[in-house]
């Protein structure tokens, strides 16, 4: 791989799928990959703010890259995929954190320290990206992309629990939404 980042091939509004086939940057798959990249960048920011004790953030980042490659895999190249095991790992991590957290009885406002707020940003980007991936199903990709949308759904939940957990450990009081 060269250090040269620019190729000028995308100047016409197209990009390459895994096969090399050129497609418009405006198709849903490419929008989804862009959102996965955005989420991955914010996970990287979160990693810079709190200790990645068991390596879960790095695993999440790899899974987000894997999800992006699954989306643009138009020639069935064998790839590392997001699996049910990845979803189970998120659920196990949430269960461990939830054991220490007080019961949630109301909606809470997304606020707190920088790491709490960054976790909430990751949560909302994951939720939006899940919806964008689901929109790809109209392009006959639903079976292939279903594990990705499930993973993103769980990932959004994970970042919500993580935000609460960080706030709890930092002794930041949650602000209950008053309706």
Question: Can you say where each PLM-predicted feature lies in the sequence?
Answer:
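Phosphate/pyrophosphate-binding loop motifs in nucleotide- or prenyl diphosphate-using proteins
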Residues: 1-179
């Amino acid at each position: 791989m060269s250090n040269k980042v620019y190729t000028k091939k995308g100047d016409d509004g197209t990009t390459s799928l895994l096969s090399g086939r050129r497609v418009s940057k405006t198709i849903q798959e490419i929008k989804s990959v862009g959102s996965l990249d955005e989420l991955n960048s914010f996970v990287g920011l979160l990693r810079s703010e709190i200790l990645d004790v068991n390596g879960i953030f790095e695993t999440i980042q790899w899974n987000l890259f894997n999800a992006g490659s699954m989306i643009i895999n138009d020639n069935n190249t064998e790839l590392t995929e997001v699996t049910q095991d990845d979803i189970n790992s998120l659920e196990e991590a949430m269960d461990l954190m939830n054991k220490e957290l007080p019961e949630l009885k109301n909606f809470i406002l997304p606020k707190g320290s920088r790491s709490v707020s960054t976790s909430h940003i990751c949560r909302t980007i994951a939720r939006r990206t899940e919806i964008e991936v689901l929109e790809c199903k109209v392009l006959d990709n639903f079976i292939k992309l279903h594990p990705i949308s499930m993973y993103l759904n769980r990932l959004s939940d994970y970042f919500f629990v993580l935000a609460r957990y960080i706030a709890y450990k930092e002794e930041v009081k949650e602000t209950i939404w008053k309706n």
